């Protein structure tokens, strides 16, 4: 399954949104909001060690391979953010208190405690908005192509 950056994501220059498969393929669109535990360059340090970043607090381990297989079986496109949900949770409303968690499960997230407004805004603009814009663009394109 080929991987590309979604055109809508390029508008923000984030490059943190991934599209795999044909945008107009199949009858479904597969989303995997918690696919990655990555903290991309430019987003600072969350104050967690590597062991914590491998835990469920940072992502849903195994979700991306399952989503890829489901997309392959259905011939559907797959869209996901290539950044940890600890930076910003793309599966929450942007104004939800837990969209940027100060703690997850039993673990404080030092890099999210007393987060400066400009840092949060950079996460929204670099991850959350491009991901949701990419989904909107994909669905709009599928509708125009008669694939929705």
Report the location of each language-model feature.
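N-terminal catalytic or cofactor-binding beta/alpha core of small enzyme domains
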Residues: 2-148
